[in-house]
């Protein structure tokens, strides 16, 4: 009922903006998009710096940064959503944050992406629609309606 404006950030991946910024009157998500053939993606160097910048922006601005992780070669819903842990969330973002899985930790306590531990995109969309007061169930997003383009999916 209430669409998102999705903006691709110029110089994406820098300054904590992530690759996409999904905006709606009541919520905003900076989103870092990653894809790989491997179910696990370890963050180091530039990718770890991106994570730290996302966390910093989330903490300073009261936003919920997300990772959208696509597993290449998977048919259907190949996207998984995970959140970056931040402090000071309020309102709907705080409520949504409780249901979205965090980035898992290695044995050394370092965050990484694990496709199996992420939330399927269709469930995330259902969750966001429910936060808008719409009556939407996970079953109302048939797999055929999932569009492979992340920018298109979130803006619908």
Protein language model features and the residues they cover:
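Domain-level recognition of nuclease-like catalytic cores that cleave nucleotide substrates
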Residues: 64-135, 146
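Short, charged, amphipathic alpha-helix that recurs within catalytic cores of restriction-modification
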Residues: 36-70, 74-75
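Beta-rich catalytic cores
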Residues: 16
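Conserved catalytic cores of phosphodiester-cleaving nucleases, focusing on short active-site segments
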Residues: 20-22, 26-37
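Hydrophobic/aromatic beta-strand patches that form the interior of the parallel beta-sheet core
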Residues: 7, 31, 66-68
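Acidic-basic catalytic patches of nuclease active cores, encompassing PD-(D/E)XK
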Residues: 1-11, 60
């Amino acid at each position: 009922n209430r669409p998102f404006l999705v903006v691709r950030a110029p110089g994406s991946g820098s300054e904590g903006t992530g690759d996409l910024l999904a905006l709606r009157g009541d919520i905003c998500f900076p989103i870092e998009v990653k894809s790989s053939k491997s179910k696990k993606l370890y963050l180091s160097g530039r990718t770890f710096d991106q994570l730290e910048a996302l966390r910093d922006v989330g903490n300073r601005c009261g936003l919920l940064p997300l990772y959208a992780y696509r597993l290449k070669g998977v048919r259907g819903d190949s996207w998984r959503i995970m959140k970056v842990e931040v402090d000071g969330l309020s309102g709907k973002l705080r409520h949504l944050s409780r249901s979205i899985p965090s980035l898992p930790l290695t044995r050394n306590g370092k965050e990484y992406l694990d496709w199996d531990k992420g939330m399927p995109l269709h469930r995330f969309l259902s969750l966001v629609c429910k936060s808008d007061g719409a009556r939407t169930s996970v079953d109302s997003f048939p797999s055929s309606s999932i569009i492979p383009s992340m920018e298109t999916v979130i803006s619908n």
